[in-house]
Amino acid sequence: MAQSGSGHMTRREALELIGMSAATASMFPTQAFAQGPTFPKGAVIRTLFKDYAPEELAGGATLFHEHMSLAPDFMDRFRAATAAVRAAQGLPPAAARAGGPPNPAPGADPMRDVTLMTQELAKAKNQGVACIVDAGHPDMGRDLNFVREAAMKSGVPVVACAGFYSQPYYPKEISTMSEEQITQALIKQVDDAPAGAFGEIGSWDEITSDERKVFRAIGKAHVATSLPIFTHTGIPGKSAIEQLDLLEDAGVKPEHVAIGHLGNLVDPNVYVHKTICRRGAFIGFDRQGGNGDAQQVPMVMALIEAGFADHLLFSADAFNDYAKTLTVFLPKLKAAGANEDVLHRITVDNPRRFLAFVPKRPRRRTS
């Protein structure tokens, strides 16, 4: 595509590059686009099929935590693990999750039908999504070939991830592997995908010794690759600070970390949220468009009003209707007083700043 005479991509050219209509893009103001963030020289956002300059994805939202492929029994195992942890802590059963879709009807699961998944991605693109991060990895049952096919057919840039999820999902050998062995396994995942982030990297609210070991290895793998890291915290997110501590102790700068699922940590004063932001990390409100929006909106507004908008990341943690962050959650924030400029920063600029990294290792050719 020919670029403008200045050598910089125009707004219209960027929209055409990702196939987005001007009408859809009207939710992203031109002024905010023109005043977008700056990135380090050589920074890229690594998707399955190419490395993008961050500026190339400025024409729409990037969703930093979604799912396109998980094992068929993933949610059953998740519910069982959650129930066991809460029972051990003397807590009542967890309430319904704060966002994301209900279980699909039999025969209508996009994660089992590449045609349906391609349609979901194409719909999200038409609704203003420029890029999606698939937050799965091998121990979650992600089928990378499935993700590749849906990304290719839909034309949506998809970031694949590397990692180990949490104790109930770890391969048995994790308990006997050294941190260095886990680090090397993670780097191999990065090269093989190729991956553009480590995530989601999880723990339950009482972090196990194996989970601490994995977090330290993730930190070492980041130092070797520069890939950003996003995490999974349990309900209500008591492990958030310790997760950041573990990663920082391993040599990770906070600006390369997003502590996830903090919409579940309900606190009108957003004390933990502010603490993490002050340390320089991002925080994820990433289960949007569901029954938890009512608790998330006032917390997001409190953080915006406190000056922490540049530390917020939004997503739905969904496997369909990916654009619900834009179509359902953002209107609620607008009704609460958020303006277009700040919403552009959160949905377009922040995830690009988070995902952009300067590679330390060459990208392997995608087959």
Predicted features by range, described:
Residues T10-F28:
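N-terminal export leaders
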Residues F28-E55, S367:
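C-terminal segment of N-terminal export signals and the immediately downstream linker at the start
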Residues H67-V114, C161-E180, A318-L330:
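Active-site gating loops and adjacent loop-to-helix segments of metal-dependent hydrolytic enzymes
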Residues N145-R148, K172-E173, T208-K213, P236-G251, ...:
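Distinct, well-ordered alpha-helical segments
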Residues H232, D286-Q288, A309-A323:
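Short acidic/histidine-rich active-site segments
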